[in-house]
Amino acid sequence: MSKNELKKAAAMEAIQFVKNVNIVGVGTGSTVNYFIDALAEIKHQIEGAVASSVATENRLKEHRIPVVDLNSVSNVDVYVDGADEFNKHFYLTKGGGGALTREKIIAAAAKRFICIVDESKQVDVLGQFPLPIEVIPMARSFVAREIVKLKGDPVYRQGFTTDNGNVILDIHNLTILNPVELEAILNNIPGVIANGLFAQQPADDLLIGTPAGVQLHHRK
């Protein structure tokens, strides 16, 4: 099976967890796009979807799936999103698509966070994929210097602006031995809006697409 077929299999499996719930949080990315396409088939069974990006909102609307604002709902029943990396502790690296801040907000608001991935995203130690951080534009150079102090190599994602009007620094060559600690350190740098580590609040469930089928892992 191709990587795209594995992504699609994981996304399709996630549909069973959102049937007959009120509000579904929807992430951003190529794997999530398969989920949105499948969600369209059961859109009559949900009240609405909270989108983590403009791109996701547009795709939901193309399928005539009702989109609701997070401020207008009291609960998000399930949040479904992909990841750029994951490890055995359910810690994730996310934000390759630049939507990390809104993704993190909806994941925190949701009762359950289901991460859909293909097996190629599994790593022993996070950091092989560059870690994105969303930064207020005026703080970009300052934050970059602080990242260098942490032994990372920050690269400005030129020509990209987040849906929140900010910029992205991608941190390369950073071996993340303690994701929970590093997430807090990065968040405490003035000018950082959010970073792509989902360790303080990891995924609740992993749906992993493999050639042998989709594996479900639940965090204990």
Curated annotation (Swiss-Prot):
Annotated EC: 5.3.1.6
Under the heading InterPro entries, the entry gives: NagB/RpiA_transferase-like, Ribose5P_isomerase_typA_subgr, Ribose5P_isomerase_type_A
Q: Which GO terms describe its molecular function?
A: ribose-5-phosphate isomerase activity
Residues that bind substrate? T28, G29, S30, T31, D81, G82, A83, D84, K94, G95, G96, G97, K121
Catalyzed reactions: aldehydo-D-ribose 5-phosphate = D-ribulose 5-phosphate
- Top enzyme class, one word, equals isomerase
Report whether Isomerase shows up as a keyword of the record: yes
Q: Name one GO biological process term.
A: pentose-phosphate shunt, non-oxidative branch
Instruction: Please give the Gene3D superfamilies that the UniProt record associates with this protein.
Output: 3.30.70.260, 3.40.50.1360
Q: What pathway annotation does it carry?
A: Carbohydrate degradation; pentose phosphate pathway; D-ribose 5-phosphate from D-ribulose 5-phosphate (non-oxidative stage): step 1/1
What GO terms fall under cellular component here? cytosol
Keyword list, A-Z: Isomerase
SUPFAM superfamilies per record: D-ribose-5-phosphate isomerase (RpiA), lid domain, NagB/RpiA/CoA transferase-like
Active-site feature positions: E103
In terms of HAMAP family, this protein maps to: Rib_5P_isom_A (MF_00170)
Q: How does it assemble?
A: Homodimer.
Q: What does this protein do?
A: Catalyzes the reversible conversion of ribose-5-phosphate to ribulose 5-phosphate.
Give the family per the record.
Belongs to the ribose 5-phosphate isomerase family.
PANTHER family from the UniProt entry: RIBOSE-5-PHOSPHATE ISOMERASE
Q: What is this protein called?
A: Ribose-5-phosphate isomerase A
Q: Source species, please?
A: Coxiella burnetii (strain RSA 493 / Nine Mile phase I)
